[in-house]
Curated annotation (Swiss-Prot):
This is Cinnamyl alcohol dehydrogenase 1. Its cofactor is Zn(2+). One of its GO terms (biological process) is alkaloid metabolic process. Belongs to the zinc-containing alcohol dehydrogenase family. PROSITE patterns: ADH_ZINC. Zn(2+) 1 binds at residues 47, 69-70, 163. Its EC number is 1.1.1.195. Involved in the production of citral, a mixture of geranial and neral with a strong lemony scent. Reversibly oxidizes geraniol to produce geranial at half the efficiency compared with its activity with cinnamyl alcohol. Does not use nerol and neral as substrates. One of its GO terms (molecular function) is zinc ion binding. Pfam families: ADH_N, ADH_zinc_N. It catalyses: (E)-cinnamyl alcohol + NADP(+) = (E)-cinnamaldehyde + NADPH + H(+); (E)-coniferol + NADP(+) = (E)-coniferaldehyde + NADPH + H(+); (E)-sinapyl alcohol + NADP(+) = (E)-sinapaldehyde + NADPH + H(+); (E)-4-coumaroyl alcohol + NADP(+) = (E)-4-coumaraldehyde + NADPH + H(+). Expressed in leaves, mainly in peltate glands. NADP(+) binds at residues 49, 167, 188-193, 211-216, 251, 275, 298-300.
Amino acid sequence: MGSLEVERKTVGWAARDPSGVLSPYEYTLRNTGPQDVYVEVMCCGICHTDVHQIKNDLGMSNYPMVPGHEVVGEVVEVGSEVTKFRAGDVVGVGCIVGSCGNCRPCNSDIEQYCNKKIWSYNDVYPDGKPTQGGFAGAMVVDQKFVVKIPDGMAPEQAAPLLCAGVTVYSPLNHFGLKQSGLRGGILGLGGVGHMGVKIAKAMGHHVTVISSSDKKRAEALDHLGADDYLVSSDAARMQEAADSLDYIIDTVPVFHPLEPYLSLLKIDGKLILMGVVNTPLQFVSPMVMLGRKSITGSFIGSMKELAEMLEFCKEKDLSSTIEIVKMDYINTAFERLEKNDVRYRFVVDVAGSKLYQ
């Protein structure tokens, strides 16, 4: 099919200001070019990053903004040069919809670190047209940033994997932490953390969930299958667990001290930061030096890793624990997410919702 020159309108739910309240918003999609895929959205997960963006917590939000970067939909049309997809395919779109294609990260298949990457929303294309996300009827996306959802995987289960799943999978893959028998810690048991437990267990790791309270102990051990549970304020138990973990995946999106968790790592252990925190984190250097420990970070994952992760989850029969809601519930869902009142990811049934009020 050739380039689709006609601009088409769609309806999304947009924030207009830092109040973060979403309401229906009609806008025009960019033209569908030869390399583009036109996708009708089926569902979209809600990520904590969406909260930061709609409320301008990072100081770089532009409005109107249609959030959503855990998007699953059906391909309706493809451009003349599209080779990866055809009409009827169920596909996913994650956090990024473009990159320069020429830099070292792009040439190394880690395009998520490209300095010119284009976010799925709250960004602009090279022609100046704003990007809008997946809480909408449709999207137009370059085929390079679209991934096939494996046959048999439910769309609503696949959606959170496009961010939460690959965010955990990527550092385990990159840092050589996929082999069976490792001992890992998951700090924070939210949308990303619960997938961390599931993926690490599927890789054959001994998994310890670390939390600030005891309230999620039964959930972590009985439902998610974690092997141990630590309350960070329990000094005796934290001391017993010192020098026991090969890595910790830190998913906490608010300020917290790092020293208690560095003490849990073995020599050469890694504390991998994933939560978006606006205030400086603190630690004393001997905590790192005396154990040759590393504090590092990881950001989502590449398109290659995204495809690998989806196949891994299909093979291991892994899925997100979700609550499905309609679009008219989205503001309540955001309020609940800010209170950590979700088990563990909201997914909006976009196709089954009335987008106009």
